[in-house]
């Protein structure tokens, strides 16, 4: 069993570069199946989710070369075969294969997706959109069968009942090679959607409106190869900004797009966090007094659900009482009992997280229950006095590239142990 050991209380300083966006690349890689030639992605993060996606692509017949942060995929050999359940079950973003396989073959046999357990994240919105485009859905054991019965998937006018990043991207990808025009209303607006649309348009797609709540896709017959730069990971950036504010004495976070983090930075400024925003970087000063605030997550451009857990250890250093309300994923509270083990004055009341600061954290044995909860525990361990041992770290490695090396370079006493 692998675990992370942190000897906390050491102030961090220096510079850390943000990697490419996990939430983009897990959609970009499956979308490449639609191409008729080689596609190259630059800025690909070294995370286990990428490794899993590469393995799936190779099992399906793609030729893949991955060196440094550059990923080259030739999808011409991809075959219409049932997708491997084991890999699919461990990877939530595997549902992005639905849209690309339907777009290329008009059918797909896939296992249901896995990933972090954050409560209801139904794929009903995806399936409703596919059905509007002529897809029939059936189930056989652990597999889901999607088929157009030999017909070409067709365009449709689709209204998303709930704002959903995954369903928006999946529908957009499926519509790229569909016959006719597709309109997605109440579409999600996240930067990662724009990133996927940019890749597809560079391949020859006709997508307009990505980043707004109405996206229009005019189907095309062929998509050529291209080269694409993955956008910076705004969630990783926010995690390091919060971490730097909590235990830093001057940390510069580079490869940051401020416009992707405006709501997050506004809440930090409300707390009293002192920082300087540069063209593609943010410098976080050593903090003095911070005040407690209320956080309420909402779809982009609101406060990202993925950032409420990584921010929690910093909130615990603030003076006063505050609350965290996650309107996106109701079960995103699993970090709370682990932080309580470390001495945090924090609890869940009526589905809301309530905290009282400042809390003095001490090292403890804790368990990462999901990706962003794991990030919260890493920050808490860096703040805490004494030794913190984090288990179940596979969740953390799913989404944070080179996290041990990056934190070590900032002066953290942190190591990954293989038991």
Curated annotation (Swiss-Prot):
Gene3D superfamilies: Enolpyruvate transferase domain (3.65.10.10). Pathway: Cell wall biogenesis; peptidoglycan biosynthesis. One of its GO terms (cellular component) is cytoplasm. GO terms for biological process: cell division; cell wall organization; peptidoglycan biosynthetic process; regulation of cell shape; UDP-N-acetylgalactosamine biosynthetic process. UDP-N-acetyl-alpha-D-glucosamine binds at residues 92, 121-125, 306, 328. The active site is at 116 (proton donor). Keywords: Cell cycle, Cell division, Cell shape, Cell wall biogenesis/degradation, Cytoplasm, Peptidoglycan synthesis, Pyruvate, Transferase. It is found in: Cytoplasm. It comes from the Bacteria. Its EC number is 2.5.1.7. Cell wall formation. Adds enolpyruvyl to UDP-N-acetylglucosamine. Belongs to the EPSP synthase family. MurA subfamily. NCBIfam families: murA, PRK09369.1, PRK12830.1. This is UDP-N-acetylglucosamine 1-carboxyvinyltransferase 2.
């Amino acid at each position: 069993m692998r675990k992370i050991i942190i000897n906390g209380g050491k102030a961090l300083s220096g510079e850390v570069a943000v990697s490419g966006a996990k939430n983009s690349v897990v959609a970009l890689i499956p979308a490449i199946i639609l191409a008729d030639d080689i596609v190259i992605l630059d800025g690909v993060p070294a995370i286990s989710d990428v490794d899993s996606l590469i393995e799936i692509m190779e099992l399906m017949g793609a030729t893949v070369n991955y060196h440094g942060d550059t990923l080259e995929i030739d999808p011409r050999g991809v075959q219409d075969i049932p997708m491997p359940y084991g890999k699919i079950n461990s990877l939530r973003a595997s549902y992005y294969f639905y849209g690309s396989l339907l777009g290329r073959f008009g059918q797909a046999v896939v296992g249901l997706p896995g990933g972090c357990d954050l409560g209801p994240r139904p794929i009903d919105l995806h399936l409703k959109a596919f059905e509007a485009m002529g897809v029939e859905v059936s189930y056989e054991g652990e597999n889901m069968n999607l088929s157009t019965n030999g017909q070409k998937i067709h365009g449709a006018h689709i209204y998303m009942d709930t704002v959903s990043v995954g369903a928006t991207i999946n529908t957009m990808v499926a519509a790229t090679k569909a016959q006719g025009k597709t309109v997605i209303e109440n579409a999600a607006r996240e930067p990662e959607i724009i990133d996927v649309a940019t890749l597809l348009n560079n391949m020859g797609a006709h997508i307009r409106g990505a980043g707004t709540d109405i996206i229009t896709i005019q189907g095309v017959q062929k998509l050529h190869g291209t080269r694409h730069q993955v956008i910076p990971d705004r969630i990783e950036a926010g995690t390091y900004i919060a971490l730097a504010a909590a235990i830093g004495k001057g940390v510069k976070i580079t490869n940051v797009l401020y416009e992707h983090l405006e709501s997050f930075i506004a809440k930090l400024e409300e707390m009293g966090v002192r920082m300087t925003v540069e063209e593609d970087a943010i410098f976080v000063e050593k903090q003095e007094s911070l005040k407690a605030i209320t956080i309420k997550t909402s779809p982009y451009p609101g406060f990202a659900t993925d950032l409420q857990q990584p921010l929690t250890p910093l909130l615990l250093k603030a003076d006063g009482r505050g609350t965290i309300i996650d309107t996106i994923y109701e079960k995103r509270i699993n970090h709370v009992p682990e932080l309580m083990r470390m001495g945090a004055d924090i609890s869940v009341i009526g589905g809301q997280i309530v905290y009282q600061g400042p809390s003095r954290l001490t090292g403890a044995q804790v368990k990462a229950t999901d990706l962003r909860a794991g990030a919260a525990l890493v920050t808490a361990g860096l703040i805490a006095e004494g030794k913190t041992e984090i288990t179940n770290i596979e969740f953390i490695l799913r989404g944070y590239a080179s996290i041990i090396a990056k934190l070590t370079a900032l002066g953290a006493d942190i190591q990954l142990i293989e038991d």
